[in-house]
Amino acid sequence: KNKGKVDGRLEGDHGGSAGILRSGKVSTWEGGQRVPAVFWAPGRIRPNTTCKTMASTLDILPTFTTLAGAKTPKDRDLDGEDISRLLAGRFDEARMEKVYYYYLRTTLQAVRQGKWKLHLPRPAKRPWLAPFAKNKHIHPKDDAAFGEPLLYDLEGDVSETTNVAQANPKVVKQLLAIAE
């Protein structure tokens, strides 16, 4: 605000800490994927509300198109979805069960559905990391190879500290089938 008026800018502040989330950028752990977003539209978005439903930057174009009262183009497919209902404070349960795919470059590394996130096995040699090899912000533990899928309950363990794959073999099987 400037003297009580908004000057028309859209600003973002992307700090260097992922807080309690595991790892950081250049990873498919939650610390590398989650980015907070702040939206402000008086009369359309209630102040001081929080939405924990997943969304993507791909959703920005269709959402802003709706908020502007325009129509999305019909001659092409848009990758994102209109999330204006979420911004208006209306929960979308169906969106919580959508499948989200976590890629690093061109390699599928994890799949999420609902509260479950499955990290797919990773080999010791990972060609997708070559461009980032000198990145000192990647923790060795988060870059380690593993031969079995790792399953996390993100509702109870957003920091991805406890692998619950052995206790939930049906969930692992279901998410592996989705990944294939």
Question: For each predicted feature, which ranges?
Answer:
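Short intrinsically disordered, low-complexity coil segments enriched in acidic
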Residues: 1-8, 160, 180
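Active-site-proximal N-terminal segment of extracellular/periplasmic enzymes that hydrolyze or transfer
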Residues: 162-170
